[in-house]
């Protein structure tokens, strides 16, 4: 087994020297375990730190990024090259379980009993293997299926502020895919608040969708290496269900912006020259490498729903702008709609879909969707007049438009199965 020694530790960055001719490859996993240390380096407490090789510095030295805290590491400690990238458990054993970036369970329910482990760095399906789908993924959510339908194997951006219903919408999607399609879901919490992750886990257990879901979390308090790689861990779990079990999988990434943010931190730690607005120069490459793995193949599909945080509401910021290039549909949640008590609070005019096309959804569906948007657009234009002068100042035709629009709004709202315990209304 190839072993080296630590020669420098600066925060989450660790430099390791290996014997001549035995340098580990880029992206290889390195393990530092308390069991393998010489007597003079034993600290009295057990630990296991996983590093990932990021650079070869010359002179048989590699620079690696830690996936957990480097507290307790010191120069001279023994490091073991695993001779492969980080591997994580995959398969049915991961369903209902909560794991971290290196596949260790963090739900205190014992080891994940999976015999199969896959590396998190994998190549995207080839041209021949890809099977671009034009098939609609029926979600059972009226406003989505009518106005911004999701494509099987597509990527959907979910935009929304705090408290407008992103989490409930995600849970309903997971529930509907599990019950109506018999499919599996994978939830990757990227730079999540730990409290929100805990809430989601409890709610999933109560609503009964946990048995069809694998969860992987790299919380806000984790080092940037873990937050940068946790999306790949979730994606690898989803790829196994797609490629080995021929499943149509739903992959949730919340929040894709944190993936970019963590990459920016790692880039700065490695001393790379920053690009526009301080982001890493490899931003487009990192995003593309991950997004290209989310696709339909001749075996199954991965449909991805990604929550997108927009810094300072600036859509031209390089992080959201790079994400937009990969999306097939956008679902925008609007606070003004949730304030009316209309849930899901999807904005029917701001939400878009690439497959809302008469050649794919059919002429009738397309015409109805456009007519609905036309009525809602007219209603929006009349709202200023209504708020200032009142309904009495409208013409009979305009009053009819308002009545139609309000009925459409109510029709496009619905009770969710997963919210039944809170609302008392059946889904």
Swiss-Prot record:
Enzyme Commission numbers on file: 7.1.2.2
Catalysed reactions, as listed in the record: ATP + H2O + 4 H(+)(in) = ADP + phosphate + 5 H(+)(out)
Entry keyword Transcription regulation: no
PROSITE patterns cross-referenced by the UniProt entry: ATPASE_ALPHA_BETA
Amino-acid positions noted as binding ATP in the UniProt annotation, renumbered to this chain: 160-167
Cellular component terms (Gene Ontology): plasma membrane; proton-transporting ATP synthase complex
UniProt KW keywords: ATP synthesis, ATP-binding, Cell membrane, CF(1), Hydrogen ion transport, Ion transport, Membrane, Nucleotide-binding, Translocase, Transport
Membrane topology classification: Peripheral membrane protein
Recorded GO MF terms: ATP binding; ATP hydrolysis activity; proton-transporting ATP synthase activity, rotational mechanism
Xref: InterPro entries: AAA+_ATPase, ATP-synt_VA_C, ATP_synth_F1_bsu, ATPase_a/bsu_AS, ATPase_alpha/beta_chains, ATPase_F1/V1/A1_a/bsu_N, ATPase_F1/V1/A1_a/bsu_N_sf, ATPase_F1/V1/A1_a/bsu_nucl-bd
CDD domains to which the protein is assigned, alphabetical: ATP-synt_F1_beta_N (cd18115), F1-ATPase_beta_CD (cd01133)
Localization: Cell membrane
Similarity remark: Belongs to the ATPase alpha/beta chains family.
Functional summary from the UniProt entry: Produces ATP from ADP in the presence of a proton gradient across the membrane. The catalytic sites are hosted primarily by the beta subunits.
Subunit-level organization: F-type ATPases have 2 components, CF(1) - the catalytic core - and CF(0) - the membrane proton channel. CF(1) has five subunits: alpha(3), beta(3), gamma(1), delta(1), epsilon(1). CF(0) has three main subunits: a(1), b(2) and c(9-12). The alpha and beta chains form an alternating ring which encloses part of the gamma chain. CF(1) is attached to CF(0) by a central stalk formed by the gamma and epsilon chains, while a peripheral stalk is formed by the delta and b chains.
Protein name (database record): ATP synthase subunit beta
Protein's organism: Peptococcus niger
